[in-house]
């Protein structure tokens, strides 16, 4: 067994799932740990799978995403969890979503971005951008605490993507997004019935001036019941 005594932070995770009796958690170590060979990192997540009696649908989804070639799909495994000396159930340990070479391999220091579609949730320490053409609301996951210049740069880059899509010119779209990654992610989301993937908790990243779709999310209540 592995024993780690460096836990520095733990909090309830999720939106609708945070209301379940069996809650999921995000937790952080004070130093990096390589859990189950997934790579060294401080931040990790425990999915409760509270609305899935089988407990396996999120695991199947993440494994399918990897088989379909969706980049940076989180590694995960099942674990039994004790909290304050009490057994609280079987959970799915996953990598948290963050820009790291062993997770989402993008270079934040040199202008890459990690964004999240979030239509309504408001967090005081997060910057948000509403796109010019379609009014889509993005949370800027990384970098944190962006400057007005960075905010404008992100706004303009997303604006170019939307302008290309609106033009109906496929070659223009190919110039600003990785169309294969978007198509693969769309097919995956349709197959898994991810009814919220277009408006909440769906992440994208800009890397080397190109926008790519990426899984990096959990399946929500609706998908677990599908």
Protein language model regions, located:
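Phosphate/dinucleotide-binding and metal-coordinating scaffold of catalytic cores
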Residues: 1-226
